[in-house]
């Protein structure tokens, strides 16, 4: 496990209560490890962090996308708070190096498990919120999610719907998605998906079928336009 100093530097925030940070990075497998001196894991913080993230992302969108209607804002929010986006944020923070887990969980591929990274990211958001206030948490989320706010059109936020609309507008059958390959351990698999519209095909990979489908749809749309 790494020292927390680098993580706090990336966050731009230093915890006053380090036990909150430790709790946010403690995997549930530790419940079975009686020698671990902290009796809490990140699940409760994850629950709170999910709500805090949704609230603050909604507020950021409401203020920054003044000309967007509710339906479009909902699509963008769905993209910003989905598992894949949260995992990217957690990966850039290198959370896999900081999550505290049992040896058994680590051997089973726990450090590269997207679910663990997503859960720890949400728990970390809750820990920041409890250790500081809503304004500081807002600023940190705005910074961590900044690159995802730069997308210029809804195609990038909801590529599957956009591809379906393109197919209908051009009198083609609806897109067909097919799982081509699954590699890796059970809880850290990499999925390869193919999407086909008429004679056009695109293959992409992701940590979930849903992520791979979105990537494939987005890539195919960029080729078609």
From Swiss-Prot:
Instruction: Note the NCBIfam families from the entry.
Output: RNaseIII
Ranges for domain DRBM come to: 158-225
Looking up PANTHER family in the UniProt record yields: RIBONUCLEASE 3, RIBONUCLEASE III
Query: Residues in domain RNase III?
Result: 4-133
Q: Which UniProt keywords apply?
A: Cytoplasm, Endonuclease, Hydrolase, Magnesium, Metal-binding, mRNA processing, Nuclease, RNA-binding, rRNA processing, rRNA-binding, tRNA processing
Record-level GO cellular component terms: cytoplasm
Q: What class of enzyme is it?
A: hydrolase
One GO biological process from the UniProt record? rRNA processing
Reaction catalysis annotation: Endonucleolytic cleavage to 5'-phosphomonoester
What EC number(s) is this enzyme filed under?
A: 3.1.26.3
Q: Catalytic residues per the record?
A: 50, 122
Task: Tell me where in or outside the cell this protein is found.
Answer: Cytoplasm
Q: What is this protein called?
A: Ribonuclease 3
Q: Which cofactor does it need?
A: Mg(2+)
What family is this?
Belongs to the ribonuclease III family.
The entry marks the following residues as binding Mg(2+), namely: 46, 119, 122
Q: Which GO terms describe its molecular function?
A: double-stranded RNA binding; metal ion binding; ribonuclease III activity; rRNA binding
């Amino acid at each position: 496990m790494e020292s927390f100093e680098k993580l706090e530097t990336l966050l731009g925030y230093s915890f006053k209560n380090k036990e909150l940070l430790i709790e946010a990075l403690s995997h549930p497998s530790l419940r079975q490890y009686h020698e671990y001196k902290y009796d809490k894991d990140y699940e409760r913080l994850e629950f709170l962090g999910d709500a805090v993230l949704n609230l603050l992302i909604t507020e950021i969108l409401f203020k920054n996308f003044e000309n967007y209607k509710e339906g479009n804002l909902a699509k963008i929010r769905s993209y910003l708070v989905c598992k894949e986006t949260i995992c990217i944020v957690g990966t850039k923070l290198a959370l896999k190096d900081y999550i505290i887990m049992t040896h058994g969980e680590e051997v089973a591929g726990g450090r590269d498990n997207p679910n663990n990274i997503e859960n720890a990211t949400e728990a970390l958001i809750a820990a920041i919120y409890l250790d500081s206030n809503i304004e500081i948490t807002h600023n940190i989320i705005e910074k961590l999610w900044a690159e995802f706010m730069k997308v210029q059109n809804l195609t990038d936020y909801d590529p599957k719907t956009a591809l379906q609309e393109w197919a209908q507008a051009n009198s083609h059958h609806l897109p067909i998605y097919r799982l081509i390959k699954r590699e890796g351990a059970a809880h850290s698999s990499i999925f390869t998906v193919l999407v086909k519209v008429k004679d056009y095909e695109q293959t992409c990979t992701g940590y979930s079928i849903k992520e791979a489908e979105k990537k494939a749809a987005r890539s195919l749309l960029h080729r078609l336009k």
